[in-house]
Regions:
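Bacterial Sec-dependent N-terminal signal peptides
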Residues: 1-25
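Macromolecular interaction modules
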Residues: 20-142
């Protein structure tokens, strides 16, 4: 009986220690992520959902976003691609079919890189969608 009690106590202690270390590791990772992204410029290119419109995710992911990322050069920290799945409100259409986001160090460098390539970017958009994107430029604060 004492052996079972001691064994149970040791297993429980091991579980608690392991769980707390995992939580601490996740917290540390999230703090590092926040610290490295804080102050970056986030350019979100959002494609609103509309009945009858199309969006070619495969082309967007494999051709368009890498093309634009190439224009941004060393100013680009990372980019993400999101595919809309559902609305946050039940029985409502999703607000966006897709969102592409570029994280850059400098807004001025971003503008300088995009300006001479604007026509090529606009022409390429027609290859994967008939949706007019909404663009939001913001600063990551946390």
């Amino acid at each position: 009986m004492k052996f079972r009690l001691i064994l149970s106590f040791l297993l429980l202690t091991t579980y608690v220690v392991a769980f707390s270390q995992q939580k601490q590791s996740e917290k540390s990772h999230n703090q590092k992520m926040t610290a490295t992204e804080k102050g970056l410029i986030k350019v979100s290119v959002m494609y609103p959902y509309a009945q009858g419109k199309h969006f070619g995710m495969e082309y967007y992911e494999s051709k368009h976003m890498p093309m634009v990322a190439g224009y941004l050069g060393s100013n680009l920290v990372k980019y993400t691609i999101e595919k809309g799945l559902a609305s946050g409100v039940p029985d409502q259409p999703l607000p966006f079919m897709a969102i592409g986001t570029f994280y850059v160090k400098s807004l001025d460098e971003y503008k300088a890189a995009i300006a001479p390539n604007r026509d090529a970017i606009r022409e390429d958009i027609l290859k994967y969608t008939d949706i007019v994107p909404v663009i939001l430029v913001s600063e990551v604060v946390r």
